[in-house]
């Protein structure tokens, strides 16, 4: 065994892995990050970055930020033209008024109420998942703070929260609006990275989850360069192009194996998905835990790619109605890429939903949806679940990744999880990494 004085080895140089690594390093730990990719990911991070991360890691917000587009979304209208929604609530209402005066009149109130509900989730997301069986004073105080936050928002917000979280996004939007294009834009946020249709229960929660960190009236996650920024900050060593497996003996993680080399560490932190993390550790795990991890719903449904685009930075949403989204899901439900896929395009990048696999004609169908020729679209091979598990009501908070193990620790002593497969899930950049680091520092 190679003697290496690492206090921690972090597997994965994504936003969560790097956030965990830098928190540990700032606490005086010697940290090695191991990542199988040869080059850093040049893509922007999609999702809210809690301000605590920027402040506590002393990140320059000017270099880690990305200019957000305005309008924040555009969608083609059936009769020609586009519906554009802006960061200014009143300006969006003016745009909506051209297609539905009734919807325009409700827009401001809808935005205000959704922002309040997303604020409740934000309060939950910057802490480890609540332990509902706890008797520890610190945990009880955290639960009390969240409850007080909700109470201060008023009776209507508490009613909205209890009523809306289990609803389908279609039910929520049908309560408020009549225009199909508007409901298609908003409904798409409710099924983002879910192999479910807009009429599935709990998709209203997914809608609010992706509203976290965004201003009122903006229902897509913000962008940042968090991963790129952390990768260049001093304090941790990053080894790229290196695939590692976790080494555990006697129920304790002792390091990782890279090729023929074994690197020792006091603890190991994995930002990989739970199934991958535990794949080689099953003989040391309880059968019930192995079963629970194997049953995590990780139904990949998104393919990414590129198109030549039109030079616009304004994201284009092709989801003309809730029915369109539901029919697109119907294909995926039976394992087929959608005949009419839900597509979002921003700059040169495209996001194709309900396409866990890429068939010969998918690129052409995506091109048709975008109104371009098929030679202008290139799709990447499907590559697993970006969120490391569906964000459904049975896989959030203290049930993520599995019930009983929501606090980033695992049955293997000295092995922790910090990826989006843990609370609060994907689409919240770095939050799981920060929460995991705080638990690790408290326990070790």
Predicted stretch roles:
Residues 115-233, 241, 392-395:
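Active-site/ligand-binding neighborhood in enzyme catalytic cores
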């Amino acid at each position: 065994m190679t003697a290496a004085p690492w206090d921690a080895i972090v597997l994965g140089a994504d936003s969560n892995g790097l956030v965990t690594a830098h928190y540990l390093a700032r606490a005086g730990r010697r940290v090695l990050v191991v990542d199988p990719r040869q080059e850093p990911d040049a893509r922007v991070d999609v999702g809210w970055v809690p301000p605590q991360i920027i402040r506590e890691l002393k990140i320059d917000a000017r270099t880690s930020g990305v200019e957000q587009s305005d309008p924040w979304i555009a969608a083609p209208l059936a009769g020609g033209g586009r519906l554009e929604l802006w960061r200014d609530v009143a300006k969006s209402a003016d745009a909506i008024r051209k297609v539905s005066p009734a919807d325009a009149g409700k827009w401001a109130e809808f935005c205000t109420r959704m922002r309040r509900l997303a604020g409740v989730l934000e309060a939950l997301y910057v802490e480890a998942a609540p332990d509902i069986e706890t008797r520890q004073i610190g945990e009880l105080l955290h639960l009390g703070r969240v409850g007080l936050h909700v109470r201060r928002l008023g009776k209507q917000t508490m009613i909205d929260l209890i009523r809306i979280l289990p609803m389908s996004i279609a039910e929520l939007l049908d309560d408020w609006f009549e225009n199909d294009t508007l409901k298609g834009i908003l409904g798409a946020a409710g099924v983002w990275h879910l192999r479910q249709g807009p009429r599935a229960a709990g998709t209203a929660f997914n809608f609010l989850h992706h509203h976290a960190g965004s201003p009122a009236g903006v229902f897509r996650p913000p962008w940042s360069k968090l991963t790129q920024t952390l990768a260049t900050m001093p304090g941790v060593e990053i080894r790229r192009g290196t695939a590692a497996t976790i080494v555990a003996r006697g129920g304790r993680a002792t390091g990782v194996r890279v090729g023929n080399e074994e690197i020792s560490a006091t603890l190991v932190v994995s930002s990989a998905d739970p199934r991958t993390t535990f794949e080689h550790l099953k003989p040391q795990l309880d059968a019930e835990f192995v079963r629970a991890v194997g049953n995590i719903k990780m139904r990949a449904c998104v393919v990414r790619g590129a198109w030549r685009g039109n030079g616009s930075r304004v994201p284009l949403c092709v989801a003309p109605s809730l029915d369109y989204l539901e029919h697109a899901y119907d294909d995926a439900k039976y394992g087929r890429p959608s005949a009419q896929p839900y597509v979002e395009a921003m700059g040169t990048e495209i996001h194709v939903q309900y396409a866990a696999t890429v068939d010969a004609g998918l690129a052409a169908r995506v091109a048709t949806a975008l109104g371009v020729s098929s030679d202008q679209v290139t799709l990447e091979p499907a590559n697993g679940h970006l969120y490391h598990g569906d964000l459904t009501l049975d896989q959030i908070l203290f049930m993520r990744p599995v019930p009983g193990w929501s606090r980033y620790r695992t049955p293997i002593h000295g092995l922790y999880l910090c990826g989006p497969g843990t609370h609060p899930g994907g689409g919240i950049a770095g939050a799981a990494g920060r929460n995991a680091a705080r638990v690790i520092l408290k326990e070790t």
